[in-house]
């Protein structure tokens, strides 16, 4: 058993370390001043073989990534997996990981004094639309935990903006179901995160599909919150997301 555990550690750790090193060394530090509010973010440019305009990929981190250092957000589960998927599939893309400030959350639903930061993310997206000529039919939104909830709220507040989305372990509390119909969305929860969350997402997914939307949901067997947010970003799910193009 000790030999098996050692072998498992050897096999898993290099993969995790390489993803972490890639995200820290490949994503350039950037910031944008928006009428007194500084939006800090990291950005990677992925150059595929195609000459087509780049897709824009936005990742929203979880609660532990909040701050002002423009680094804590890079610990977000899934960043490395998304980046490596884009690279290995030769997808021209700008991948942006904004940092939510300490006093905010993406959706504004984390506490009584909480301030939503998604409007600034939308303005960051608009900046790249006007300044870089990205492919506006291929803007993708992904996030985990607090960022998963942020995904749902951005789909709610800005329908028609995104080609597709993936929300890992984040709920859609307070969202207007009709607004969510515009965007194909894949969501996940771990089974150890609770039946209430899973049942709510099953109900929402069924409603969206019944009313002309496109939604998928998977309950990840035996996984707790931290495990589920890491396991959500598989190649198969990312393939589903990036196969979509806004009509």
Each PLM stretch: what is its role?
Residues 1-23:
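Bacterial Sec-dependent N-terminal signal peptides
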Residues 184-247:
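C-terminal catalytic histidine-bearing segment of alpha/beta-hydrolase fold enzymes
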Residues 17-56, 93, 122, 142, ...:
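A domain-start/cap signature at the N-terminus of enzymes
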């Amino acid at each position: 058993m000790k030999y098996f555990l050692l072998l498992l550690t050897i096999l898993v750790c290099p993969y995790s370390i390489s993803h972490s090193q890639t995200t820290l060394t490949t994503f350039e530090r950037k910031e944008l001043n928006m009428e007194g509010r500084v939006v800090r973010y990291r950005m990677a440019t992925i150059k595929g073989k195609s000459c087509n305009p780049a897709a824009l990929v936005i990742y929203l981190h979880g609660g532990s990534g909040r701050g002002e250092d423009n680094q804590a957000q890079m610990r977000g589960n899934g960043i490395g997996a998304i980046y490596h998927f884009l690279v290995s599939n030769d997808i021209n893309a700008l991948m942006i990981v904004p940092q939510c400030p300490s006093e905010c959350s993406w959706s504004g639903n984390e506490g009584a004094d909480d301030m939503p930061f998604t409007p600034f993310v939308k303005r960051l997206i608009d900046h790249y639309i006007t300044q870089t000529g990205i492919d506006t039919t291929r803007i993708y939104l992904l996030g985990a935990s607090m960022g998963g909830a942020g995904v749902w709220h951005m789909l709610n507040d800005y329908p028609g903006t995104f080609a597709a989305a993936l929300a890992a372990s984040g709920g859609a509390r307070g969202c207007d179901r009709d607004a969510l119909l515009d965007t194909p969305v894949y969501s996940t929860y771990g089974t150890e995160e609770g039946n209430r969350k899973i049942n709510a997402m099953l109900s929402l997914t069924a409603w969206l599909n019944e009313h002309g939307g496109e939604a998928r949901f998977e309950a990840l067997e035996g996984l707790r919150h931290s495990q589920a947010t890491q396991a959500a970003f598989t190649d198969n799910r990312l393939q589903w997301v990036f196969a979509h193009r806004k009509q």
